[in-house]
UniProtKB/Swiss-Prot annotation:
Its EC number is 3.1.11.6. It is found in: Cytoplasm. It comes from Brucella abortus (strain 2308). Bidirectionally degrades single-stranded DNA into large acid-insoluble oligonucleotides, which are then degraded further into small acid-soluble oligonucleotides. PANTHER family: EXODEOXYRIBONUCLEASE 7 LARGE SUBUNIT (PTHR30008:SF0). Belongs to the XseA family. Disulfide bonds: none annotated. It is an enzyme of class 3 (hydrolase). Keywords: Cytoplasm, Exonuclease, Hydrolase, Nuclease. InterPro entries: Exonuc_VII_L, Exonuc_VII_lsu_C, OB-fold_nuc-bd_dom. It catalyses: Exonucleolytic cleavage in either 5'- to 3'- or 3'- to 5'-direction to yield nucleoside 5'-phosphates. This is Exodeoxyribonuclease 7 large subunit. NCBIfam families: xseA. It holds the Pfam family Exonuc_VII_L. The gene is xseA.
Amino acid sequence: MASDSSFPGASSNVAEYSVSEISGALKRTVEDTFGHVRVRGEISGYRGPHSSGHAYFALKDDRARLEAVIWRGSMSRLRFRPEEGMEVIATGKLTTYPGSSKYQIVIEQMEPAGAGALMALLEERKQRLAAEGLFDPTLKQLLPFMPRVIGVVTSPTGAVIRDIIHRISDRYPLRVIVWPVRVQGDTCGPEVATAVNGFNTLPDDGPIPRPDVLIVARGGGSLEDLWGFNDEIVVRAVAASHIPVISAVGHETDWTLIDLAADMRAPTPTGAAEMAVPVKADLQASLASQSARLSSAMSRFFDQKRQAHRAAARAMPSADQLLALPRRRFDEAASRLTRALFVNTQKKRVHFDGHARQLSPRLLQRRLVELERGVTMLGQRLPRALEAFLRERRTAFTHRANRLSPEPILRRTRLTGSTLEQLDRRRDQAVRLLIERVKRRSQELDRLMRTLSYESVLERGFAVVFDAQGKPVKQAAAVSPGDALSVRFRDGDVGVVARAGLTIPDPTKGQ
């Protein structure tokens, strides 16, 4: 039999480790050696921040991939929002998980890998959103000339809000509503988008008035500082806003995607306030100037009309001149009227005399004879006409009397009476049937009640057990030894005391 010393390595001086020991040693070596490293790579598989506030992703390059995690505390200190595909430089420490032989970097700080990477990402996003029409100039809204309420989305503690309020107060004091947001960091974009959407959802007649124009403002800063205003959700919220939006982010040389989506871009927050409201003094001066111009124009208008009236009055002839011709025509017509009346009277007199000569007694006598003859003829025709009329009326009366015979009415009356008798008989029969049915149903219910009644159960030899409170006992498990019970039989109650060790007989053994 071969000795154990014959196996290779049996007498070697190499230390022997368990899996846990070698994994722990490897963990200590990695964490000691790479306790503080800077890693450059592209963000891949970004997931976060979760409800816990942590974010998980990987850093990769062309040949390798390193898992990464940012805990909640470090995540809140980032000056930008990590995004898929962004090239960054991460500072942290490497650690391993002995249970799964995996390692990752726990990131404590992270920054974009130079402005070039951010500019490339910004240009790609700009082209994509522009293709969707979010920057279309035809969709821009006009700013109201005289807004009543202005909504401002900015930090409530910075110099920006003070400059805006001060500028508005100097130009035209009105109501300003501030929606406080963070203007830098990972939560900047979501908070700005929420503020714009929140202002748009305010009702016109609510306790908080709906603004007529919005100002999204922030002071100057680096590309990383302003990165939250390049967030896609901010651009979409501003483009979808029904309230005109003025973008005032950074200095005049700075630009962000919100500037392209807004309805107006201001070089500074103070400039945004100047765009939003006019100067009250300028309005008053303009109003006074226009009022003076209106008064001057009205004076000139009335002077011109007054001069035209005077010129027309001078050109108009006098009353005597105007009435001279009509007066002469009236006098001529009056003289002609006198002559015409005389001539007409003479004509009428001659015509009357001619008719008077025609009215001789013999002519009147002849006319009277003709009238008497006509009356006589009508008197002879009248009896025959009257008899024919009466005969026609009598025939019509007889015809109508025949139509009004009582026989059809009597026949209809008899038919109606027969129908009423049938209905009476059917009603009486239905009432009797209903009464019998109700009586039978009542008898059945009475029998059922007697069968299921409490007394019927006792009559059949059963008994009911009550506890000390007089409540029925439904289960043996509800009774404890020594409990005072009452057993009710058909003819009375018996008091008993429960004992221990009783068994429940099997009802099937006696069969």
